[in-house]
Structures are given as C-alpha cells and as structure tokens.
Amino acid sequence: MYLLHCNSLLDMKIVVKANGGLGNRMRVIASSIALSQRLKTTVEVLWINNVALNCSFFDLFQKLDDIEIVESVYIKSWNKIAHRQRRKKLWNTYQNFDIQLNDEGLKSLSSSQIDLLEHIKNAETVFIDTCEHFYGDLSCLSYLIPADGIAETAKIRLSETGGAYIGVHIRRGDNTMSKANSPTALFIQTLKKEQKRNADIKFYLATDDRGEAKILKKVIGKSIVYYPSELARKRPEGIQQALVDLILLSNAKKIIGSYWSSFTEVASVYGNIPLEVMKSEE
C-alpha cells in the first residue's frame, strides 16, 4: 500500500484528453474528478472541439474545482494542414511523458486487474487519451453542474412536460451497435407495455434521428413528448440541446435506452435512476 503524501504523487502532472461525444466526455471528466480527489492534485483535461463535439465546456457546465479545462478551437474538416499540425503538436507535447495510456492501455490494466494508481505511482508525468470511464465510479458526474442557460432551458421543459414521466433514448447516427441491437420495434413494444400499466404515462423522447421520433409519435401518440433539435454535433447548439435532453432523461422515473450508448448510461447515473436497455435477443 502506498501513501498519498508521497512526493511522486503530489508533484505528478496528469493530463487527460477527453474524446468522443457528450456522454463519453462526461464519463472522462467524472473519472478525472475522481482521480483529482484521490490524489489531491489538479488534473488537466484537454477539451478539443471537433466533429464529435464542437461546444465549449463552459457553455455546457460550470467551472470545476481542481480540474483545469484546456480547450482547442474547432477546425473545419477541409483544413487538413491545421488538423495535421494539431496532431503533431499533441504528439510533440506528450510523447515524452513517463506514462501514456489510451483506450487499449486502460483496458489492458483493467483486464489484468492492475490498479491505475499503482501503475502510475512512480511517474512524474502521465498522459491519458480516452473516451472511457477510467477511474473511480461515475458518481462524480454529480459535480458537473449545468451552465445557467442549459439549466434554465431544462427547467422550462420539465415544467412543460409536467408530472412523472419515463425517459426514452433512441441512439442512431453513427452508432452501429445501437442500431443493430436496439430496434425500433422493441422500443414500441416496451412503451406499449408501459401504457397498459398506466394509460396516462408520458414519454420524454431524446433521439438523434427525426425519423424515429416521427414513427413513435405516430404509433404511441400524444404520450410522446419530443422537442425537435439541432442534430449536428459539429454545431454548439446541437451539443447544448443534447445536454438539455440528457438532463430531462435524468429527471425521469426511469430510462428506456439504447444498447452500447454512453449517453443512455450517463443519463441514468446522472439522475441515479433505473435504466432498462433495449437489446434484441437475435
């Protein structure tokens, strides 16, 4: 057992690059908070705006204690030179860090049952490049307090939705696992069962596919509460609206969600509510 007041831990520089979309990055931030609290040190988090998520952290959440958010601006996809320069700068900055861990490296530690702190305890510099939850549990999501504008929009929607409701998250887009394992028919079947239990139940629907919303509204009817939104993740408005959806899901009685979706998982943990994942048995 090692001691937290050991200089190698107190003086350690830890940089975490948060990858992926909103749900993924929230998991990474929660892990960074847990690590920061355990080591009693500041963790630097790289927040790179890109096609997966283009929105300032501070337009989504309030400032965090002991987490230093370092943002990089969005670069348009056609600007190959700028993208190459960014990759080169990242490589040059972190290639000589004592320990460098990506998703595969973190999975290897986990499968080998090696504790992350034990692995890094003698390092002076650590670079973690991931879209995954890598340390502690996800309870540290509670430290992610929505920015004022996000909170106000969510408050209005909660008032308009009125009363108890069930959250429904249908993930489509580029998530092939969700599309393959969480068919629309299974969602419809489950929602109809809920209606039989309670004819007055409402469903708050969050989805990145307007076609899915159209189908559910046609089949399930007025019980569906749905706010059409900007779906492009490369637009800040799209990410802000996604966070509002996540907050509404987290305030539901429970979530009926998609398989292999970090958004579904994070919404459930964020609200500490039950999650029922739609997964076909075929």
Residue positions per predicted region:
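Short, solvent-exposed loop/turn segments at secondary-structure junctions
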Residues: 21-22, 48-53, 132-133, 171-175, ...
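Secretory-pathway luminal glycosyltransferase catalytic domains
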Residues: 55-198
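Catalytic donor nucleotide-activated moiety binding site of glycosyltransferases and closely related
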Residues: 169-173, 192, 198-236
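Histidine-anchored nucleotide/phosphate-binding helix
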Residues: 26-37, 187-194
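A short, glycine/small-residue-rich beta-strand->loop->alpha-helix junction that serves as a flexible
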Residues: 18-27, 175-181
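Nucleotide-activated donor-dependent transferases that construct or modify glycoconjugates
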Residues: 6-20
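A donor-sugar binding/catalytic signature common to diverse glycosyltransferases
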Residues: 20-21, 26, 30, 242-282
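A structural signal for short, well-ordered beta-strand segments and their strand-loop junctions
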Residues: 15, 42-47, 167-169, 204-206, ...
